[in-house]
Amino acid sequence: MRFPLYLILISALAACSGGSKSPADVSEVLLKDIFPLSGDALQWSLKATNETELKSYLEKTLVSADKIQIVPPILSAVGLPIATSAGLSGAKSSSTPSQTTLQEAGVDEADLVKADASFIYSIDPLPNSEGRLMLNRHKLGPSSGNPNLSLSDSLRLGFSKGVQGSSLYLDSDRKQIAAIGTQSSGWSYGRMPVIDWFAPTAWRNGATEVVLVNAPTSGSLKQTRQIKLGGHLVGSRRIGATLYMVLRSYPQNLTIGSATKVTDYLPTISVDGAALQSLVEPSACLVQSGNANASADIITVLAIDLATEKHAHAARCFTGGTEAFYMSDQNIYLATTRTVYAMSGDVPQYAAETSTDIHKFSLQGLNMAYRGSGNVKGHLGFEQNRKSFRMGEFNGTLHVLTETRTNWFPTLVVPTPLIAATNVVNIADSPGRLSVLQEKQGTLAIVGELPNAKRPEPIGKPGERLYASRFMGNRGYLVTYRLIDPLYILDLSEPTDPKILGSLEVSGYSDYLFPLNDGLLLGVGKDAISDGLPGDGRMGWYQGVKVALIDVSQSSKPLEVDRLIVGKRGTDATVLQDHHGIAIQILNGQVKVAMPVKVHQTPTSYMNGGPSDYYGFSWNETYKFEVNLSQKKFTVRNSLPSSLKSERWIGNDRAVIYMDQVHYYQDGIWVSGTW
């Protein structure tokens, strides 16, 4: 199913094309695209178009798509995709606070909380429940003595009515904040925005805004610019002063006829209250004519220079869809499931034969160029916040992990033997698949796969699902799970011949993997125990939060060298919902880790003593521990308790480590303590 988005690239390279560009000047800064040779274009390829062709395409799809009925969302609800990641920013010195965890070093990600050597910035709800509109700056105290933060100053962000602040970027060198706000036209379901992915018109009235704020060390916060964009925010990235955002929208103008211009169907931009203009020029758009699930959704690639006094931007767009993206420091890859799938509650059910399209654009400041598209078997998984982790780039080669099972719920799967006498398992039974893609003549060609005829060993056991995955250089790490946690190490040094180097089986699973150095991984997930029922013994119940230290220095023999279990069944950690929900600081061979958790370990009257017993809520806290990299051991420190005593949703909780202090954020409320 195509899930079109806008990809907004907000760039801060002042030297590009001599300064400010208006929307009408967009095409002047575009790089040359690379398309397949005639006859080599595949059904997933994008192609150049013109204003007439684009208008015809959009009007044709508008006629059919607008007939779709919007169904009650509670039955088909998914949250807006989260742009996810999980790398680490090592501390430069003890006076540097912990930073947002990142998937790619040097590719920053937005979050509710940002910090530098002097201040912690947060985007907070107003006390009168008007929404998350307040930018607060707290002064960090000295290394010893009272660790409590002091409020330095505040600024009510100038978002439009109905737009809520969602995240921040901090440019410490320029003393600049970029605050992002969003407005959803979807329904509200609890704390998650609910959108029906299969009713494109639900995306028609979305809005995204960027507010720029000067943040001098001595002086007050001051808003300097407001950029209003048509479209729903899906995710963002930043390289230096260049901010990259992904949005999705649907034409608001449904009038079809000769008097309607194609720009009437395209998203708009307004800067500092100026009149609305087209965000992207038709000549900068591409179409996916081979898409059988065509819709009028548009993905726009926009670059805005944030380092200049005057607004400047460039833009691209393509029709089709994207449900996830991954970005390196040079390229962005946009992926979407090709076949239609249904929803079961808030998780998808994929078609039996599913594949995923991937589109590549190169990035160079305000310049963006289409480099080709590819298609891989399988899908990127069931959880939106893990999909970007399924992709990774190394030396220009893209690695993609997909899975083959059609639904989230555990099932009993019997492998299909190819040859009973040799007990060789059918490659199709592998829960995970690795595809290796390289750019070739305007396409992304598959040059290597796992499993394959030469290396048929499956990635995971029958019935398992992919959980954590992480690409680091010429190594890949992934976790599958049903009861035990098989960690696989992949050798990606030869693109045409990837291989499994080793595996490790331990109880439970990891949702995220964080590299601590070249030989140690930190895994965070859940423990699990067997259900005790007859069968293959691989069905189990998850328990408390599990933290594992995994030695991968010998790739063929990975070892779990230490572990921690937090709470009982029902315990949750923010990092399991959002990879930014963990603070990791690495300094002089010592690692400090702080993660907000909601601990459940209170027995209840309906428990029966079995592994499925769900414990009652006990307390909220920031759980703290250290990792000795040379000894490969955990040391638990005293937790920092929350000032909020009742059970609550912890998805927005954060922690910041600063010297011998730890600061615990809970939706605008700070609790501070010593390490």
Role assignments for model-derived ranges:
Residues 17-675:
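Beta-sheet-rich non-transmembrane sensory/scaffold domains
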Residues 4-14:
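Bacterial N-terminal signal peptides
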